[in-house]
């Protein structure tokens, strides 16, 4: 696919989703059955309306059955499914119905709350609609078909995705809101996080624990002793996920994360990528100065490359109260961020150090344990 975007001065090639791959392979199957000839490429319209010419990597057909495969090309966005083959079998039927299912390597939903019903193949609504429409257009109105999408590498590749968090077991999902993969875009990632949040809400939860990643997850379960069932990753998208909790009417949010990540939120930085905003030292220096810390400490902290290194200096100087000040600012900033939209959300914060453990919390830990047990 020769379509590009520019990001930070660099040129990146776009690609296409697993949903587009499945639609193209399905169309190739139908064309081979109808023409009784091999098809090396097909033209498909993606879910977003873009027309693409997709190469077909594998072809096999008989009178009323065909198999085709398309290799996933994510462009310069090398995700978990890039390069894998998406296979489709199409069998013509005597009725006019077109049905779609997933086979080997396509995950199955095991929990309520996502856009796929329990027991169904993890083929999301937009690509499902697109695959069915593509086949119907090629077949005409009076013929029917059974479509089976499968991916031999799917179960292994799925280990590198968030599917298990969503209760999708046994393989990958067939995805694609637009059908196009845009490199350096966070939208797909954010959508996955939102899906997990929606699943928790649909299961009846009205309070949620947001963590930046594995460190926070481990600390919640192994140090605080809270249930893993309340935990959802927010990655670097703190503001986005806070807004999502409000949209979904969660009443309480507990953010638990490493101090080096959450300290940024105290200064109103709600996307915590270091490439976008790395003001950790500056925030620490400002808050230490307000507490009356000596210039020598401020200068030493400013030179630290990590909050772990700064933490050692802060502890030696006896200014650990700075952590209490900062967690309260994180809480205040977060609640102010949500202030002008309803419903209201109560936010609490726990932050920790890899070397020093628990640093500070907006409430006593025993009180939080009672609230979140």
UniProtKB/Swiss-Prot annotation:
Pfam families: CbiD
Lineage: superkingdom: Bacteria
Methyltransferase found in the keyword field: yes
Keyword presence, Transferase: yes
Any one Gene Ontology BP term: anaerobic cobalamin biosynthetic process
Reactions the enzyme catalyzes: Co-precorrin-5B + S-adenosyl-L-methionine = Co-precorrin-6A + S-adenosyl-L-homocysteine
GO molecular function terms attached to this record: cobalt-precorrin-5B C1-methyltransferase activity
Pathway where this protein functions: Cofactor biosynthesis; adenosylcobalamin biosynthesis; cob(II)yrinate a,c-diamide from sirohydrochlorin (anaerobic route): step 6/10
InterPro entries to which the protein is assigned, alphabetical: CbiD, CbiD_sf
Keywords from the UniProt entry: Cobalamin biosynthesis, Methyltransferase, S-adenosyl-L-methionine, Transferase
Its EC number(s): 2.1.1.195
Family in the record: Belongs to the CbiD family.
Protein's recorded name: Cobalt-precorrin-5B C(1)-methyltransferase
